[in-house]
């Protein structure tokens, strides 16, 4: 009874690399639009931003084209002039995130302005999973894209890494529900990103190396 009076809830949120999977059967327009928004919200400086994209190999080209259009609709032809697109928080963050731009082939974006701490929304291809861009939390507007050939391969890739703070899936709902049962993450969305944190009736927190404890809900 004495201890109960002094119990204090604790939430330790540590972030991590949150995967976004785009599987066969996904609505590419929806996937590109929502991923573009979630990745460039606060210039990617959110703990639950999509940190890397796993996409079915057959969808890569179409997604890239659609993602470019989605970014243009969000931020215009020049994101640096957009009133809604923010800058990296400090010079150290700028240098760290800008360093990822050389770790893959730039498919979209890639422009920087150090004086303005500006990094254009960027999609990277031909990325090696062993490179720092795939080993460290990016916390910026750079999205590495890796192809997969079947769902089992994508889920094995996620499960071989530390448990993420968030897990995002675009594809048929049935397959997505199965993916949730086969992975572990702090939170998750099917055919959306970020939005699970907006509902104060849902618990939020991490698991494993992405944190412990829950709040809301």
Predicted feature residues:
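ALDH superfamily catalytic-core signature
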Residues: 1-128, 151, 190
């Amino acid at each position: 009874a004495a201890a109960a009076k002094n119990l204090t809830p604790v939430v330790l949120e540590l972030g991590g690399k949150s995967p976004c999977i785009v599987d066969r059967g996904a609505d590419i327009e929806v996937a590109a639009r929502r991923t573009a928004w979630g990745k460039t919200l606060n210039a990617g400086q959110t703990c639950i931003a999509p940190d890397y994209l796993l996409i079915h190999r057959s969808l890569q080209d179409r997604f890239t084209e659609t993602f470019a259009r989605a970014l243009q609709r969000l931020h215009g032809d020049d994101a640096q002039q957009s009133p809604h697109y923010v800058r990296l928080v400090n010079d150290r963050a700028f240098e760290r995130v800008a360093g990822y731009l050389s770790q893959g082939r730039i498919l979209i974006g890639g422009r920087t302005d150090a004086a303005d701490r500006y990094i254009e929304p960027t999609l990277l291809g031909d990325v090696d999973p062993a490179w720092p861009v795939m080993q460290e939390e990016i916390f910026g507007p750079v999205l590495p894209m890796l192809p997969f050939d079947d769902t089992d391969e994508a889920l094995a890739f996620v499960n071989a890494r530390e448990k993420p703070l968030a897990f995002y899936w675009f594809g048929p709902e049935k397959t997505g529900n199965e993916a949730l049962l086969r992975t572990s993450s702090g939170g998750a969305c099917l055919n959306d990103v970020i939005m699970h944190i907006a509902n104060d009736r849902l618990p939020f927190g991490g698991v494993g190396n992405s944190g412990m404890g829950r709040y809301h809900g």
